[in-house]
Design a protein with these regions (language model features):
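An interfacial alpha-helical scaffold signature
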Residues: 2-254
Length: 254
């Protein structure tokens, strides 16, 4: 989730609390365990955001920006100096705890330190973090020249798997369809693949929302589950044309 810092920048002197938050952020770039600890700490840490310098609205309204992927996100920062670096003449800096920030804008997408190799928090991840402190682990792999995906002739998933994912996708109008196939087991443990038909601009959110919903359940059940996406405008990939592939959400795609 948290990307490597693309380059070092010089900032104004930070407070000890900001320095500690930055230290935790650097550790989070290297380890998922530290990433979980960082986000839990972030909830009670002081963070900074941008608001319009002139606004008569009774509640503080935060400024959003359009991410290169096409969605809008609320930027927030681990230090005042980083918030200043990204500000402009029409912007004022507001401070609050991470918890107050996330709770105060339900349904919003957030981006931490957007100018400094930060990360995106999608609405589903915000809900999970606020409710139980969970942070899903998502590793993006390119299939490339790896072995082709071969489906077993019949999938036997846990009873909870497809209903849980269907509930996620019902709140995501950009998800067109979803398919399930069972792959060759790994060390005796069942292995499944869920393929989501979704436009490229929403693919990452769909995968991360899915992972957030089922990662703990998969670990408790001792099964492996991978996620894949494909552009519905380009039709189903060849691996979804095999016997044993089950469409469990949305209409059949050509």
């Amino acid at each position: 989730m948290i990307k490597a810092n693309p380059k070092n920048r010089a900032f104004l002197m930070s407070s000890p609390a900001e320095q500690d938050l930055e230290r935790r952020l650097e550790l989070a770039r290297l380890s998922h365990d530290d990433e979980v600890l960082f986000f839990r700490h972030l909830l009670d840490a002081r963070v900074y955001a941008h608001a319009p310098i002139s606004d008569d609205y009774p509640r503080t309204r935060l400024i959003q920006f359009k991410h290169p992927a096409g969605f809008y996100a609320v930027p927030f920062f681990t230090s005042r100096s980083k918030a200043l670096f990204a500000s402009g003449p029409t912007v004022r800096i507001v401070q609050m705890t991470g918890r107050d920030l996330l709770q105060g804008s339900p349904g919003a997408t957030f981006m931490l330190n957007p100018n400094d190799g930060g990360c995106v928090l999608y609405p589903e991840e915000v809900v999970a973090l606020l409710s139980d402190g969970s942070v899903a682990r998502v590793e993006i792999l390119e299939q490339g020249d790896s072995a082709p995906l071969v489906s077993l002739e019949e999938a036997n998933p846990p009873a909870w798997l497809m209903p849980t994912l269907m509930a996620v996708y019902m709140d995501m109008p950009f998800v067109r369809a979803a398919y399930l196939l069972e792959l060759t087991p790994i060390d005796g443990a069942s292995r499944f693949l869920v393929a989501i038909a979704v436009g490229p601009e929403h693919a990452e959110r769909a995968v991360r929302a899915s992972t957030t919903a089922i990662q703990t359940l998969c670990a408790e059940a001792g099964i492996y589950l991978d996620m894949a996406t494909f552009n519905p405008q380009e039709g189903r990939p060849d691996y979804l044309l095999q016997r044993g592939v089950e469409r469990f959400y949305g209409p059949q795609l050509t």
